[in-house]
A protein has these predicted regions:
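Short, charged, surface-exposed secondary-structure boundary motifs
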Residues: 82-91, 162-165, 190-192, 207-211
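Domain-core and long-helix interface of multi-subunit machines
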Residues: 7-32, 98-193, 221, 258-305
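A structural signal for the main folded, soluble domain(s) of proteins
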Residues: 72, 137-141, 237-240
Length: 317
């Protein structure tokens, strides 16, 4: 067990309103990825036991910069990268400057160039939710390529199923990557559901431990009920946001509100939709872990671990 008196906690995967529009086809102009203000995320994280706070908005550090002057915060982001062939991966990058953000964004369509830059700059880089279908399809070479350049692997994601997290943990043992945890919160209710622990006394020591890979993931996995509840919360927040925009007289707000009102009756089907998504996520994780592990075994490097076995060799702070 970790001695809590010698440990600092930080949710290394959390979003704010700066993550931009939803990526779901057809909803981009109606719903945002998140509606929480950076200060609200910080308050929620600290209330739930986090010692440090960072934001990992999609390809943006605007929210993180709002907190950057605080002693318990550091700047991070979630970079949307493309592997050869155009498939997406999400990478968490931590403790970066504005100049590094610009450099990362200019390289995000060339994964090898991005990894060369993070290695040169000693930027911790984590492959987030590696076995999630939400970033699109996977080819067999995508994850090995990502794992060769990353320093960490997210093995405890507060929105992903236990099976998806188990697959990530087993893959991380094969790839010998340090392990991280984060809530992947898109609503305030989910902030700090999962997090990363490092033995440290202050922010400087925490970041040094993060760079050294002396990390331990903690917290819970996602469930069908939590996923459904978060999507319902986002739907309500989307409606409230459009009402405020109409009151302010913003151009285009009224048609968007009308579109949401028209879609409202279909909310009764959301539990069915999320059930299908949740089931697909579990199948996707199992299938792609087996393909990844099979590739390792065929290459004669290591025998793949069984899912659910103790994480021997896992990173420890």
């Amino acid at each position: 067990m970790i001695d809590a008196a010698r440990t600092m906690r930080c949710d290394l995967h959390v979003h704010s309103r700066h993550s931009g529009p939803a990526t779901v086809p057809g909803l981009r102009h109606l719903v945002r990825e998140c509606y929480a203000e950076p200060w609200e995320v910080r308050y929620a994280a600290r209330e739930r036991g986090m010692d440090l706070v960072t934001l990992t908005d999609h390809d943006s550090i605007a929210g993180a910069l709002e907190l950057a002057g605080l002693p318990d915060a550091f700047v991070s982001e979630e970079v949307t990268c493309l592997v050869p062939g155009g498939r997406e991966l999400h990478l968490g990058v931590y403790d970066i400057t504005e100049a590094q953000h610009e450099a990362l964004q200019s390289r995000r369509r060339d994964l090898e160039a991005l990894f060369a830059y993070t290695a040169e700059q000693r930027i911790p880089v984590c492959v987030n939710h590696p076995f999630s279908a939400l970033t699109g399809r996977r080819e067999d070479g995508d994850l090995p390529l990502a794992f060769r350049g990353a320093t960490h692997l997210e093995v405890r994601n507060g929105m992903m199923s236990a099976r998806s997290n188990d697959c990530a943990r087993a893959a991380g043992r094969l790839a010998r990557l340090a392990q991280c945890g984060g809530s992947d919160a898109h609503t305030l209710a989910s902030v700090a559901r999962a997090f990363t622990c490092v033995r440290a006394n202050d922010r400087t020591e925490f970041l040094a431990g993060l760079r050294a890979g002396l990390t331990l993931p903690a917290g819970g996995a996602g469930t069908y009920a939590r996923l459904t509840a978060d999507i319902m919360r986002l739907a309500v927040l989307a409606g409230a946001d459009q009402v405020r925009r109409v009151i302010r007289g913003e151009p285009g707000a009224l048609p968007r509100l009308a579109a949401l009102v028209c879609l409202a009756p279909f909310a009764v089907f959301l539990p069915l939709v999320t059930a299908a998504v949740y089931a697909d996520e579990q199948l996707f994780a199992w299938r792609h872990y087996r393909r990844f592990a099979g590739g390792i075994e065929r290459a004669g490097r290591r025998r793949p671990p069984l899912l659910g076995t103790p994480a021997a060799g896992a990173s420890r702070p």
